[in-house]
């Protein structure tokens, strides 16, 4: 059995001087990042990752619309309630807002549901939040591709 030699690859997250990622100007990744927030997948399209962009667009938009069809509740920031309720409402609001234009258009067109008891409405609320959280992950991916930390 041959002796194993240590790998010559650097550990993930560490770079030698010769393999450090190049300095990328903010303008190179900020536009795709904002586009990725407004329209899910648009940042990937701008960075020429069309397959990934299409998959993200379909995933986030369908998840958001399933949440709407199930009459899920969109969170609004509430203060004055107990700490846990405020934390949940603010967290849900940030997740909903992260869906970008989907959330903005649904709010502009007057979509609002009262919080009702029932499993379907509860699942709808979870779908609306999940759409925003998926878009946050897509935005992180856009930033990593834009700064050339990932292909």
Feature names for model-found ranges:
Residues 36-41:
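Hydrophobic, membrane-inserted alpha-helices
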């Amino acid at each position: 059995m041959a002796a194993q030699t240590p790998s010559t690859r650097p550990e993930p997250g560490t770079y030698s001087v010769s393999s450090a990622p190049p300095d990328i100007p903010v303008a190179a990744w900020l536009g795709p990042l904002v586009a990725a927030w407004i329209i899910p997948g648009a940042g990937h399209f701008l960075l020429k990752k069309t397959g990934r962009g299409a998959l993200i667009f379909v995933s986030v938009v369908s998840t958001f619309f399933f949440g709407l069809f199930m009459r899920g509740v969109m969170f609004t920031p509430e203060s004055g309630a107990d700490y846990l309720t405020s934390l949940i409402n603010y967290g849900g609001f940030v997740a909903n807002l992260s869906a970008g234009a989907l959330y903005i258009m649904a709010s502009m067109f007057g979509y609002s549901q009262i919080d009702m008891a029932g499993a379907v409405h509860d699942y709808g609320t979870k779908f609306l939040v999940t759409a925003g959280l998926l878009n946050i992950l897509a935005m992180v991916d856009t930033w990593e591709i834009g700064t050339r930390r990932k292909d």
